[in-house]
Amino acid sequence: MKNTLRNILLGGLVVAMTASCELNLIPTTDITYEEGTPLLLTERDIAEFQNGVIASYRGLHYGSYYQTVEVMTECFNATIDFGNNYGFVHKLGSGFLASDDYTTGIWQNHYGAIKNYNIALEQCEMVTDEELLPDTDLLKGITLFCRASSYLTLARHFSADYDPATAATELSVPLILVYDQLHKPVRATLQEVYDQIIT
């Protein structure tokens, strides 16, 4: 009995000591983004930004981003062992709503990638070293393509079909061309979105 009581007391002390430790430590090795600070200082920086842009783009072009659309539009017929995978999408039932994970994932992840693209484009404009300009121009071109691709996907999924007669008044998705955490974007017209995609 004495040993049990002593073990409980020691266990309580260990828990109390652990809980009183300072666990809210601030990391000192992270890189924080400060607006206006140049990040593209070497060829390696540009190559790493380019890898990040391409990784963001590649991450948006597989899996549920495309399977959902395929299941909806290609009239796939479920077999007996399909396990109700993409069930609501397959039958377009009342459970498939705008708040469905397949829908919100497309919206969230494309805008997350657009944020990365906008930061990369902002950084490209800050490069003044003549030796880095060719690599910077390549990064800028890749990033503009990736951002246009994301806007095209968003416009196709969350807007009406493009009709030249109504494009100037039909609302589409928000156009965010500069990274600003505090900005509350409004929906742009379909014409504005497609003009941005083309340019």
PLM regions with names:
Residues 134, 157-196:
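Short coil/linker segments at helix-helix boundaries
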Residues 1-19:
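Sec-dependent bacterial lipoprotein signal peptides
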Residues 21-70:
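Membrane-proximal, proline-rich intrinsically disordered regions
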Residues 86-158, 188:
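Conserved, well-structured interaction surfaces
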Residues 39, 43-44, 57-59, 63, ...:
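A structural signal for short, hydrophobic/glycine-enriched beta-strand patches
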Residues 58-63, 78, 150-161:
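Secretory-pathway/luminal and periplasmic proteins that interact with or process carbohydrate-rich
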Residues 34-35, 82-102, 169-188:
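Short, helix-capping/interhelical loops that line the mouth of catalytic, cofactor-
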Residues 51, 55, 115-122, 195:
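Solvent-exposed, polar/charged alpha-helical surfaces in well-ordered, non-transmembrane soluble domains
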